[in-house]
Amino acid sequence: MIIKFIQIIKPGIIFGNIISTIGGFLLASQGDINVNLFIFTISATAILIASASIFNNCIDKDIDIKMQRTKNRAIAIGLISSNIAYIYALILLILSFLLFLKTNFLTIFISMLGFFIYVFIYSLLMKRKSVYSTIIGSLSGATPPIIGYCSVKEHFDIGAFILLCIFSFWQIPHSYAIGLVRYNDYKIASIPIFPIKKGSFKTKINIIIYIIAFFISTIMLFFAGYTGNNYLFFSIFFGLIWIFIAIKGFKSSEENFNIIWGRKIFLFSIVIITAISILISIDYKKNI
């Protein structure tokens, strides 16, 4: 049973977001790391994401049971009651907030705003109704690196804005690719994702547009003076590979091809965002 309580906080998602949070923190620190601040920021962010994940599972339990990918989730099948899950999530939210008090007001505001957007605006209000819910959700998905960055800087500057662009633009092709791979799941659950409402061709066009926007944003971090030459080289290298993979999506519109292609877009999205997070952690410019 303990394993089920661990599973509903989605450890994989926490891990991925913590990598980007560390990236933002180290980019802002420029080698001068406040260890206590680092521990509080990373811990608070991880716990906040865990809380948001549980709230999301509770809200989505009726649609999770319909989808092949999510039908065995503990809350969906009743192994963990919604009331217990909500209490669990609320305790984690309070604990996260208390840890964030060790940072600064801006970091607290950004973290709580990201939580609010994900749980209330995306999960509760838009996911079942709007084809553009992914775009709204991308804003909350982009908050972890900004939390890490602003916990150090204590202000929202051009660096934070570029991070917002990078991680927001990344979220959309990442999510649309999942939509193509799990198209039938979302259709059965009546979730109006972009691939279902707009079709595969428009989805592929949008994936390319957002990948290019992501690519430009990653480069801007260099030209704004935040990162070094190694970052520029590898961000261009990985970015061009992702664009190349995306362009190949127009070879066919068959469902099986879309699933295979969507999986490639999805998998490489994880590779590239991990690479970017690591690069901003180690190849930063000082005195920015």
Curated annotation (Swiss-Prot):
Q: Which domain of life is it from?
A: Bacteria
Q: In which pathway does it act?
A: Porphyrin-containing compound metabolism; heme O biosynthesis; heme O from protoheme: step 1/1
Q: Name one GO cellular component term.
A: plasma membrane
Q: What is its main location?
A: membrane
**Positions in coiled-coil regions:** none
Among the GO molecular function terms of this UniProt record, one is: protoheme IX farnesyltransferase activity
* Function per UniProt: Converts heme B (protoheme IX) to heme O by substitution of the vinyl group on carbon 2 of heme B porphyrin ring with a hydroxyethyl farnesyl side group.
Family in the record? Belongs to the UbiA prenyltransferase family. Protoheme IX farnesyltransferase subfamily.
Q: What is this protein called?
A: Protoheme IX farnesyltransferase
